[in-house]
Every structure is written in structure tokens, then in C-alpha cells.
């Protein structure tokens, strides 16, 4: 299981949709996106903004200029041809129900990669006396599903407030919210950080755990209007 964690409004979903654009739309790998917080339409709009390089605000208002309209038309063709499937879990789904949806998508569509946005929003199959036990159950179930179905699960997760108490402190594995079991279940843990007050700018993806590799950090460029992360700062200009 591959885990991407950050504080709210840092860009977890934007990073996930950027990965979808590369894995599914670019490489045509069958992908399932389990959305527990935003509607399917909201995720689809973010993917459109990323692929077309048209801002979310412009897409919402619908006042596209001819150049933007052409980019949206082209992006729509690319997205429509991609093997991308959705599971809407906004109303609440247990880990068992999410597992059933993943297995169905694997059987029906040959899905190879699953995104879960986000882990702490998935419900446990039964109530526990402590929140940490509930999150631990969900994390363990997602790990088991990944292993049994032979799929790569990319789970998003929240960091707790400790990462923000000290100004300038980078996130740590111990900042994962609600359960240390998440850290133990994940094969790779990446912690995303940036200045949330900037709509564009540099970001860091800290590889805090990697079971079969080295840890370190990767520099990214955040394009807030397009809900996108690029790995090359020279791509920050609007085409």
C-alpha cells in the first residue's frame, strides 16, 4: 500500500489526480478512484483542469475563450478514452463495502491501481471503543485487499495538528492521524508539504518510509488553479 499524507488544503487530492493523469490517462492503466469526501463530478472536474490546463474557476463559470475551449475538447477526448472508473463513497462505505467494490472493478474492468481519498473517511465494519482501533481496522483491510486482489492501492491520509505546532517543522511519520497502524501497513509513506497560502509554488514530497528502497525527498511544483503537481518547475507556465 502506498500512502500519501498531508494536512488539509495542502493538495492530497490534487497529487492523487495528477497521478491518475499519468498512470491512467497517460499510460492507460485501468484505475479505480474511490472518493469518500468529494463527489465524482468534483474529482472529474479536477482531472479536467489538470489535463486541459484550464483553471477550476473558469470551468465552473463556463466562460472559456476559444483557446481554452479547444484544450477542454482535446482533454475530454483523452479522459474519455482512459480506463478510469469511480466508486462514490461520499455517503459512507465500510472497508468491507469498499473491498467488494474493488474486487468487482478488478473482475469487470481489470483494474490494477486503486486510489482511496481518503483513508480516515472509510468506515470500519464495526464500531470500536477507540477511533485508533477503527482506523487501524480500515488500514489493515485496505492492505489485505491490495494483497489479495494484486492491485496497487494509493491511499490518502490526514496528518494531525502536531506537524503545524512548530513553525517550519517538516512532517514526520508520527504525525499520521488516528493510528500508528497506518504507518505499519503501508509499504511506502510520502508526506506532502508546501505553503498553503500560495496558489502556485514549490512543494516537497518527503519519502518517510519505503520498504524496498531509500527515503528522501522530491521537489514538486504546485499549480493550484489547475489542481496539479508537476515534477518540473519549467512546466509551470500556462500553455
Annotate the PLM regions.
Residues 36-38, 151, 156-158:
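Conserved H-loop
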Residues 53, 88, 95-111, 140-149, ...:
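C-terminal regions of RecA-like/P-loop NTPase motor modules
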Residues 103, 111-155:
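Helical hairpin unit composed of two closely spaced alpha helices linked by a short loop
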Residues 16-19, 98, 134-141:
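Hydrophobic alpha-helical membrane-association signature
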Residues 9:
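Walker A (P-loop) phosphate-binding loop of P-loop NTPases
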Residues 5-6:
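The Walker A (P-loop) glycine that initiates the GxxxxGKT/S ATP-binding motif of P-loop NTPases
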Residues 12-13:
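Conserved lysine of the Walker
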Amino acid at each position: 500500500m502506498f500512502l500519501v499524507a498531508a494536512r488539509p488544503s495542502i493538495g492530497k487530492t490534487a497529487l492523487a489526480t495528477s497521478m491518475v493523469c499519468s498512470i491512467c490517462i497517460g499510460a492507460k492503466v485501468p484505475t479505480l478512484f474511490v472518493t469518500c469526501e468529494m463527489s465524482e463530478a468534483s474529482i472529474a472536474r479536477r482531472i479536467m483542469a489538470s489535463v486541459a490546463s484550464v483553471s477550476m474557476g473558469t470551468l465552473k463559470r463556463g466562460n472559456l475563450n476559444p483557446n481554452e475551449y479547444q484544450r477542454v475538447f482535446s482533454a475530454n477526448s483523452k479522459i474519455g478514452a482512459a480506463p478510469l472508473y469511480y466508486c462514490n463513497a461520499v455517503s459512507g462505505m465500510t472497508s468491507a463495502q469498499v473491498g467488494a467494490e474493488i474486487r468487482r472493478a478488478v473482475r469487470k474492468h481489470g483494474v490494477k491501481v486503486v486510489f482511496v481519498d481518503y483513508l480516515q473517511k472509510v468506515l470500519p465494519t464495526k464500531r470500536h471503543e477507540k477511533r485508533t482501533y477503527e482506523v487501524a481496522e480500515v488500514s489493515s483491510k485496505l492492505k489485505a485487499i491490495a494483497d489479495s486482489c494484486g492491485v496497487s492501492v494509493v491511499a490518502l491520509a490526514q496528518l494531525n495538528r502536531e506537524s503545524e505546532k512548530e513553525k517550519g517543522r517538516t512532517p514526520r511519520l508520527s504525525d499520521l492521524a488516528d493510528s500508528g497502524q497506518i504507518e505499519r501497513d503501508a509499504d511506502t509513506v510520502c508526506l506532502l508539504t508546501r505553503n498553503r497560502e500560495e496558489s502556485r509554488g514549490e512543494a516537497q514530497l518527503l519519502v518517510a518510509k519505503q520498504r524496498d528502497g531509500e527515503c528522501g525527498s522530491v521537489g514538486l511544483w504546485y499549480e493550484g488553479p489547475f489542481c496539479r503537481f508537476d515534477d518540473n518547475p519549467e512546466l509551470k507556465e500556462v500553455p
